[in-house]
Amino acid sequence: MIAIKNEKELQCMRQACKITAAARALAGEMVRPGVCTKQIDKAVHDYIVSQGAKPSFLGYGGFPGSSCISVNDTVIHGIPGGYVLQEGDIVSVDVGAYYKGFHGDCAATYPCGSISADAQKLIDVTKQSFFEGIRFAKRGNRVSDISHAIQTYVESNGFSVVRSFVGHGVGAQLHEEPEVPNFGSPGRGPRLLPGMTLAIEPMVNAGTHEVRILKDKWTTVTADGKLSAHYENTVLITDGEPEILTVAEGL
């Protein structure tokens, strides 16, 4: 069942999402050569807790970090640890915060120092594909209208969208209905209604869309070893234009 949030619930969600977005921004500022991914995770954890919230990911299904930090060919669910960032890496940071009963969820991929033109294009196309998708995140449209727009834009730029993992509803639970794929034909899936809150998150690979999960049962990498990027925001469906909730202004 798809949860429709009322205004009181949305007030809590907006705050959760502001905290989440600020934690993402903090992580992005830390991405530079010589920084350990565990350092970034600790900063994310400490910031979220300082705001009276809890890291949504910590302990979720046994996940050991407060954020997912995925470098280069790691698509999602990278476990923060001893890896020291190097010049030329691309670093995806996925963050969630739980505040007064509701979750925020967002992600972005950041360059570490100077990166290749191809890597920068991948980051840019991934981010823009999100904005292409939310043009269709409007009352009366269907979920797959978002999906189709993302896929069309990504593939027109020579990249592929991951199919094994998808976006999702978010609210009182970190993962709620409906699923929001980044691929598919338009005009399918549930109709969008005001009060729906969706984590729309293109995961885009430079090569094949296929992925594999490592022995730690979390780290998900591209099957061909090529780069991957990720961009995500929590989005509210309204009577008019969609509202991106994971923005940090005014915190």
Which role fits each region the language model picked out?
Residues 1-251:
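Active-site neighborhoods and metal-handling regions in enzymes and metal-associated proteins
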